[in-house]
């Protein structure tokens, strides 16, 4: 099988490059991250500013940080100088939202992470407002609201999927549990180019990979995992995949021609898309119930193991052999509700909702942390932004650059 991961944004334009959800290839890998020669006893806070509430993760493009958050009741996009923490510009709009009582503790968002491409920053608000801004000055280029298109403009717990840019198209899954559409828009104009209406949106974000020379946009939907051709929206394949409360929420991980899938109480499985007699099918390679990932997505470490944070045992770091599904090692239990995982400079960094960052060797053969740091004084749900100069951490309301 011919397979590759497709780069979905512009190539590296500077040393630091983290333009979207989970980095340049949406896989948690930070090629520009350097890290210290030796991890110190404590990290230094170089700057810290108030940016607002929400789980949206910071991104980096055009030499600046972009943070999407809720500030004074308005969804606010801020551009921030990475050296000083100075806010360069902000753009905001009123964003009233009533959170489902089952997720009250998560606040009113936003949860979706922006994407930077071609001088534009795209945001997707918790109630389903999709916007394109100039990265230079924040000027609004275009905006889409879907109240006239769908009965609900967001899933039960609010929009959490992070849009993706592919070959001049911004692709987002709009709508809610009563119907939605995976839709492609022209990045410059916002004109709709295609839509797929086979299922409502999940809380998960897509990736793009190429199988048998055919690009696949792969994502979870409300009740399935599926792939469409990103140029046309043509459905290539779809598998039933349902979790409690219709809460599909992880990003599929591409590993050597297979997809690592998981969800709340769903275990972990590997499936392989195959083209047979002109039709696409997905063959299950293995499945394990010994771990399960929810509200976090694993990474593929340098030693070939998949490192993730299982919600079993009340939160536990695990390493899985992607060829067999065997758990090679696991960390201590009771580590938190969720974790954000990135890797680079020979280490895997695991950020838990308990505000801890565990530093592991990327080639570790057992759970043996190099360091464990407290990185915030409030819960951390957003993914960190790894830069050459340090790590940017978003907690409940603040954004901070931690260095060494």
What label would you give each PLM region?
Residues 14-404:
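Noncatalytic, solvent-exposed loop/strand surfaces
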């Amino acid at each position: 099988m011919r397979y590759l991961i497709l780069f979905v944004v512009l190539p590296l334009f500077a040393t630091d490059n983290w333009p979207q959800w989970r980095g340049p290839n949406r896989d948690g890998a930070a090629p520009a991250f350097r890290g210290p020669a030796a991890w110190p006893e404590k990290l230094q806070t170089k700057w810290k500013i108030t940016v607002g509430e929400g789980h949206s993760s910071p991104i980096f493009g055009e030499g600046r940080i972009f943070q999407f958050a809720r500030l004074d009741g308005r969804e606010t996009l801020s551009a921030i100088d990475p050296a000083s923490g100075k806010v360069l510009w902000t753009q905001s709009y009123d964003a009233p939202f009533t959170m489902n009582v089952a997720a009250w503790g998560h606040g009113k968002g936003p949860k979706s992470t922006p994407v930077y491409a071609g001088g534009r920053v795209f945001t997707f608000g918790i109630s389903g407002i999709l916007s394109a801004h100039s990265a230079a000055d924040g000027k609004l280029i275009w905006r889409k609201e879907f109240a006239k298109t769908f009965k609900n403009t967001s899933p039960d717990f609010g929009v959490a999927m992070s849009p993706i840019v592919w070959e001049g198209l911004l692709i987002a899954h709009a709508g809610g549990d009563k119907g939605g559409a995976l839709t492609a828009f022209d990045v410059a104009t916002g004109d709709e180019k295609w839509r797929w209406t086979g299922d409502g949106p999940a809380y998960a974000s897509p990736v793009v990979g190429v199988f048998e020379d055919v690009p696949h946009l792969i994502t979870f939907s409300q009740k399935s995992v599926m792939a469409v051709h990103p140029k046309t929206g043509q459905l290539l394949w779809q598998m039933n995949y349902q979790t409690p409360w219709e809460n599909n929420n992880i990003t599929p991980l591409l590993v050597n021609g297979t997809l690592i899938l998981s969800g709340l109480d769903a275990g972990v499985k590997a499936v392989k898309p195959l083209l047979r007699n002109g039709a696409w099918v997905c063959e299950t390679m293995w499945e394990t119930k010994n771990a399960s990932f929810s509200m976090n997505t694993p990474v593929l470490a340098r030693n070939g193991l998949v490192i993730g944070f299982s919600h079993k045992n009340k939160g536990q770091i695990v390493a899985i052999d992607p060829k067999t599904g065997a758990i090679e090692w696991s960390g201590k239990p009771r580590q938190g509700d969720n974790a954000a995982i990135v890797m680079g400079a020979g280490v895997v960094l695991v950020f838990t909702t308990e505000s801890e960052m565990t530093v592991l060797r990327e080639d570790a053969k057992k759970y043996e942390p190099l360091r464990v740091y407290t990185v915030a004084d409030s819960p951390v749900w957003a993914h960190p932004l790894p830069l050459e100069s340090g790590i940017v951490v978003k907690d409940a309301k603040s954004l901070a650059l931690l260095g060494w």
